[in-house]
């Protein structure tokens, strides 16, 4: 009986201990589960944050494709909107029909003798071989059908280098906004619609890819080791891209003007801002910038590897001299101010761009946007790309003046802006290539404005 009583008295005690222990275990398991969920959520957010730019760019590209192809969902759609589009369609067709090679003699130009093709555009080959690749999966597709999609695809790919440029110049928000502003620019859309296989889309793709490549190479310079892999690989890739650009369009030298101008001004500014003008300090400036000079030398070598076998040794000086002759040559062959201006005036590339005010209004197509959206013109003007660009430069100047920040970004974008602004007053064609400047500067200004407003909250 005594044992039974002892057992009975011990049982509640054991139960209390067991319940307490069980509750502790449950609480520990709950804490562990909560911690695991928090860790998993943190990992998921980090993964999402890492892949968010990729997702955003894919969505931007899909929407860009849809916008440029929307006209073909209707019954009466336009095709081959200008004579250049017809010319490239014809060359691509000749390459396809001639087993992958463009005939050296063009029977349809300068009739009845024809025209000898010296260096055909790489764009015609890219289009023809891309068509051959897609025909593997869609054997019944014809070339004219493929060229509905091809220019829209090339224009949409511009979102990638635009994002990289904005990201390297400021941050990822600026990169995403730059992609949006660039591919949905009215100026760019009008020159890269589906069924209009002119070279504007691929020219813009090569131009921005060249600039993005240079910025990546510059931001990854190893100043301590001259022969570091990064000092060779990135500039070499950039040189190859610019070389392919040269095989595509004669105005490739715009990329060289930006790069060479930036390097020269960077070297001079480093020398001037320290206010020490002796040989010893000049040697220090050279030492600090030697990796940049070396990377440019690698870029030039890679460029020559691509271009000299095609154009010959005489082309070696072209990247450094083309810019000096092109604007004067454009004015010379146009003759707009003469009594009988010649046929070149009828070509959009050759028409005068007007003054700076005309260029600023044209680049934003403010009246067209106001009419299409119903938004008052004054509000459109206040949010115009030109004013946002000016706001961006004001911020960059302020950041450099107060905190010595963003000087490289300020220098690079200033060269880009001034260079293309002057070119746009000479020929209306170059207004299109001022579009990336507005897109990127507007993106940087709005991204910085967003950061300021969020911090205030």
Model features per residue range: what roles?
Residues 1-72, 83, 176, 232, ...:
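Start-transfer (signal-anchor) and selected internal transmembrane alpha helices
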Residues 44-85, 90, 97, 103, ...:
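Transmembrane signal-anchor helices characteristic of membrane glycosylation enzymes that use polyprenol
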Residues 60-65, 136, 149-168, 173-222, ...:
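Membrane-embedded helix bundles of polyisoprenyl
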Residues 67-169, 173-181, 185-206:
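Active-site lumenal/periplasmic loops and adjacent helix-entry segments of GT-C-fold
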Residues 219-226, 232, 242, 255-304, ...:
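Perimembrane helix-loop-helix junctions
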Residues 224-229, 274-292, 377-415, 452, ...:
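Membrane-interface helix-loop-helix junctions at transmembrane boundaries of multi-pass membrane enzymes
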Residues 254, 419, 426-457:
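Hydrophobic/aromatic-rich transmembrane helices and adjacent perimembrane loops
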Residues 328-399, 409:
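Alpha-helical transmembrane segments at the extracellular/periplasmic loop-to-helix junctions
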């Amino acid at each position: 009986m005594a044992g039974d009583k002892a057992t009975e008295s011990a049982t509640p005690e054991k139960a209390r201990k067991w319940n307490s222990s069980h509750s502790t275990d449950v609480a520990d398991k709950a804490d562990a589960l909560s911690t695991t969920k928090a860790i998993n959520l943190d990992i998921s957010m980090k993964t999402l944050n890492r892949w968010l730019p990729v997702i955003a760019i894919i969505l931007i590209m899909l929407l860009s494709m849809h916008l440029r192809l929307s006209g073909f969902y209707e019954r009466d759609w336009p095709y081959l909107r200008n004579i250049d589009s017809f010319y490239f369609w014809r060359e691509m067709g000749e390459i396809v029909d001639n087993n992958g090679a463009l005939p050296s003699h063009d029977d349809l130009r300068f009739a009845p003798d024809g025209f000898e093709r010296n260096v055909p555009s790489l764009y015609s080959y890219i289009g023809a071989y891309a068509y051959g690749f897609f025909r593997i999966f869609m054997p019944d597709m014809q070339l004219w059908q493929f060229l509905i999609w091809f220019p829209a695809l090339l224009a949409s790919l511009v979102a990638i280098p635009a994002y990289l440029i904005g990201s390297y110049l400021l941050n990822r928000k600026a990169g995403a906004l730059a992609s949006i502003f660039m591919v949905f620019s009215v100026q760019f859309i009008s020159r890269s619609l589906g069924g209009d296989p002119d070279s504007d889309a691929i020219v813009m793709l090569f131009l921005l890819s060249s600039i993005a490549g240079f910025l990546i190479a510059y931001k990854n310079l190893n100043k301590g080791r001259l022969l570091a892999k990064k000092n060779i690989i990135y500039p070499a890739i950039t040189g190859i891209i610019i070389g392919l650009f040269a095989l595509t369009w004669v105005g490739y030298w715009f990329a060289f003007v930006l790069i060479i101008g930036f390097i020269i001004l960077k070297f001079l500014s480093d020398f001037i801002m320290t206010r020490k003008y002796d040989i010893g300090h000049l040697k220090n400036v050279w030492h600090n910038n030697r990796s940049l000079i070396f990377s440019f030398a690698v870029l030039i070598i890679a460029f020559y590897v691509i271009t000299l076998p095609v154009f010959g040794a005489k082309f070696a000086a072209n990247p450094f001299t083309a810019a000096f002759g092109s604007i004067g040559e454009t004015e010379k062959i146009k003759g707009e101010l003469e009594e009988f201006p010649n046929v070149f005036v009828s070509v959009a590339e050759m028409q005068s761009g007007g003054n700076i005010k005309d260029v600023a209004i044209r680049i934003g197509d403010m009246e067209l946007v106001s009419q299409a959206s119903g938004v008052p013109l004054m509000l459109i003007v206040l949010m115009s790309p030109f004013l946002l660009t000016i706001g961006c430069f004001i911020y960059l100047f302020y950041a450099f003046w107060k905190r010595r920040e963003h000087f490289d970004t300020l220098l690079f974008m200033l060269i880009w802006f001034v260079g293309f602004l002057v070119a746009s007053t000479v020929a209306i064609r170059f207004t299109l290539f001022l579009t990336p400047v507005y897109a990127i500067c507007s993106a940087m200004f709005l991204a910085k404005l967003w950061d300021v407003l969020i911090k205030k909250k």
